Each structure stands twice: as structure tokens, then as C-alpha cells.
């Protein structure tokens, strides 16, 4: 599977940045979006030596109209998109004793509605053309509820459910959809974590795994494998076994 034109949100740092550079090295023309224009300009400059090209389109994914305009401009500039990676997101820990509305509202706007705005802009085009591939970056934290992740985990669970719901309908039109569920990846976001992160991998490693999974047409691209399978086992546990484990996480934190 080859892609000539790609759009990636959340491209300024972390997984998005590494993924863009990987695709540019393969010769793709990659439109990149993030809120911080300086990050995108630096990314485009770093990609100068690649066989592909990186084109900055600064954007706040919570602005529906801005997302639609950006997709219009991108396709006018580089042509119909082959692959869209909806990667923009944030993490805000929420503890029960400091429970408040704002982190939920913020993460719903960025993590969920940011993806919805992207899908609303590209899916009608893909369906009309009967081709295209969209990848939604969620997280293994969306598999099941975890302490301090009431907002973040819920937002990522929504993305997984959304992708599962859309897949059988998009299959009818030849449009691919994938959901990416990483474990811990070393990025500026995870650098803020104050707890151990087992099986931590680098952003370049994550980008390679994502590209490999997308090329193979996988619906779910989850990594690293041992960490993912541990979470999938937890997802199957009855509450009588699951909650004693998560209570230990609260005690240890």
C-alpha cells in the first residue's frame, strides 16, 4: 500500500512528529497540523533532506470550521488525500479528590471532537472517491477504567468505540479505518508522568510500528505487544478481580 498525500494532526511533537518524518523519508507529501506554528516550521525544515515534503498548516482541531478550511486548502495544494492520521490529543490526570468539570470538557474538545471534526471533513470525500485511509490515535488506556484516567481514558475509549462503529459502514465504500492504541511512548506528554511507565518505547519505534500496521491494513495497531496483551487480559477480568488490582495502583501512587 502506497500513499502519496497525507495529512497528520498533532504533528508538532511526539508520535505525530516521528510519523511525519518517517512518511516524508518514504516520499510522501505530508500536510502537518498543530497549534504551534513554530513546531511545524521546524519539522518542515528538518524534512528538507527527505524525498518527500512537509507542508505546515497550523490549526486548532477544536475549531470545526478551521478544520474544514484546512482540508480544503490541503487538497487544493497537494491533491486528494490518501491517508489521514488524526493524532492531536492531550492528557490531564483527574483524581477523585480534585474532581472538576474543566479537564473533562477540555479533553472531550481536543481528544474526541478534534477527531470528529477531522472525520467530518474527510470522510465524505473518501466515500465519494471510494478510497482513502483514516487512522485515529487512541490509547490502551481506553480499554478499561484506570485510576486518575477518568477523563483521558474515557476520551480514548470513545475513539475506539467510534472507530469500531464506523468500520463496517466504511468497508462498503472501500474506505479503510484504523485505530492506533499505543502503550507508553516517550514524548513531551509522557515526560510529565510521575509514575513508572513499563515497556516504554521511543517515538521513532512507535512511528515504525504504526506505518507497518497501516500498510498491512490492520484495524487495530496496538503496541508494545506484551503490554497490550496484559491490558487485554485485564479487560476480561470480572470486577471482583479487577478492582483489587486497581486499588493497589491507587495505594502505590
Language model feature labels by segment:
Residues 10-13:
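Conserved glycine-rich cofactor-binding loop
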Residues 28-43:
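Conserved glycine-rich Rossmann-like NAD(P)H-binding loop of the short-chain dehydrogenase/reductase
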Residues 58-69, 101:
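The beta1-alpha1 cofactor-binding region of Rossmann-like NAD(H)/NADP(H)-dependent oxidoreductases
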Residues 95-96, 100-108:
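Substrate-binding pocket helix/loop in short-chain dehydrogenase/reductase
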Residues 119, 155:
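Active-site helix of classical SDR
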Residues 139:
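Residue(s) in the substrate-gating loop at a strand-loop-helix junction
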Residues 179, 195-230:
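C-terminal helical subdomain
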Amino acid at each position: 500500500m502506497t500513499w502519496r498525500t497525507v495529512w497528520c494532526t498533532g504533528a508538532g511533537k511526539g508520535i505525530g512528529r516521528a510519523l511525519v518524518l518517517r512518511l516524508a523519508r518514504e516520499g510522501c507529501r505530508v500536510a502537518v497540523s498543530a497549534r504551534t506554528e513554530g513546531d511545524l516550521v521546524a519539522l518542515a525544515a528538518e524534512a528538507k533532506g527527505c524525498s518527500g515534503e512537509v507542508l505546515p498548516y497550523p490549526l486548532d482541531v477544536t475549531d470545526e470550521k478551521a478544520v474544514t478550511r484546512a482540508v480544503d486548502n490541503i487538497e487544493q495544494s497537494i491533491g486528494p488525500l490518501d491517508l489521514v492520521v488524526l493524532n492531536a490529543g492531550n492528557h490531564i490526570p483527574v483524581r477523585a479528590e480534585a474532581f472538576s468539570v474543566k479537564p473533562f470538557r477540555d479533553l472531550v474538545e481536543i481528544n474526541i471532537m478534534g477527531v470528529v471534526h477531522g472525520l467530518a471533513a474527510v470522510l465524505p470525500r473518501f466515500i465519494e472517491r471510494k478510497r482513502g485511509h483514516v487512522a485515529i490515535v487512541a490509547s490502551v488506556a481506553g480499554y478499561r477504567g484506570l485510576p486518575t484516567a477518568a477523563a483521558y481514558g474515557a476520551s480514548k475509549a470513545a475513539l475506539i468505540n467510534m472507530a469500531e462503529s464506523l468500520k463496517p459502514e466504511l468497508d462498503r465504500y472501500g474506505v479503510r479505518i484504523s485505530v492506533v492504541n499505543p502503550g507508553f511512548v516517550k514524548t513531551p506528554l509522557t515526560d510529565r508522568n510521575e509514575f513508572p511507565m513499563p515497556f516504554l518505547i521511543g517515538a521513532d519505534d512507535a512511528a515504525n510500528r504504526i506505518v507497518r500496521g497501516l500498510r498491512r491494513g490492520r484495524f487495530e495497531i496496538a503496541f508494545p505487544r506484551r503490554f497490550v496483551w496484559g491490558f487485554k487480559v485485564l479487560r476480561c477480568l470480572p470486577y471482583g478481580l479487577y478492582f483489587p488490582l486497581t486499588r493497589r495502583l491507587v495505594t502505590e501512587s
